[in-house]
């Protein structure tokens, strides 16, 4: 083992704005990103891992992703929101910060909840999960099983969630489901 640090680990999850890398998307640049990327090696107290977007029908024990110390080569691929969050925490707290990014563009909050909770929602058609009738990013529970649940063994200080636009058509239920998601996530991380 090399380059180990003792500090705090945070989880950053959400949709496309959490996915957006430091170098931006095509035709969607990020202001001052070149300077932030050039400065990345000056932050040895930060570690980042992006969990590979994976959908699964059952909760997985392991996910794909490796911890990285920021360099000018790898920083452009880091989630911009997650990296800026890590920078702010590290500068403020003056301790090492690790960030786990679990994100999928366009996903709904239901994609980040387990089957046991989804079964209580009368408006959720769980028969569509795993089918080609609905785009994967809109399906319930798949991100939870393939991306989020495998990270529950990490000890984390907390988490941030960025977005909710894919739930715009279900705005009446979003607030309650977001609160349920937060409560469930806190329970699996024993917070």
Can you say where each PLM-predicted feature lies in the sequence?
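Cell-envelope and extracellular/periplasmic
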Residues: 1-191
């Amino acid at each position: 083992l090399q380059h180990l640090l003792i500090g705090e680990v945070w989880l950053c999850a959400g949709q496309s704005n959490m996915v957006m890398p430091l170098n931006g998307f095509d035709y969607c640049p990020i202001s001052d990103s070149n300077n932030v990327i050039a400065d990345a090696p000056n932050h040895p107290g930060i570690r980042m891992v992006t969990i590979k977007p994976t959908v699964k029908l059952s909760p997985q024990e392991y996910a794909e992703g490796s911890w990285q110390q920021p360099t000018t080569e790898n920083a452009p691929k880091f989630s911009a929101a997650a990296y800026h969050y890590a920078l702010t925490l590290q500068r403020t707290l003056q301790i090492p910060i690790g960030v786990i990014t679990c994100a999928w563009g366009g996903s709904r909050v239901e994609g980040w909840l387990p089957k046991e909770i989804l079964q209580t929602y009368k408006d959720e058609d769980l028969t569509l999960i795993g089918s080609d009738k609905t785009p994967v990013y809109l399906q319930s529970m798949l991100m939870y099983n393939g991306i989020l649940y495998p990270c529950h063994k990490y000890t984390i200080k907390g988490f941030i969630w960025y977005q909710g636009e894919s739930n715009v058509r279900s705005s009446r239920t979003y607030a309650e489901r977001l609160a349920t998601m937060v409560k469930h996530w806190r329970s699996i991380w024993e917070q």
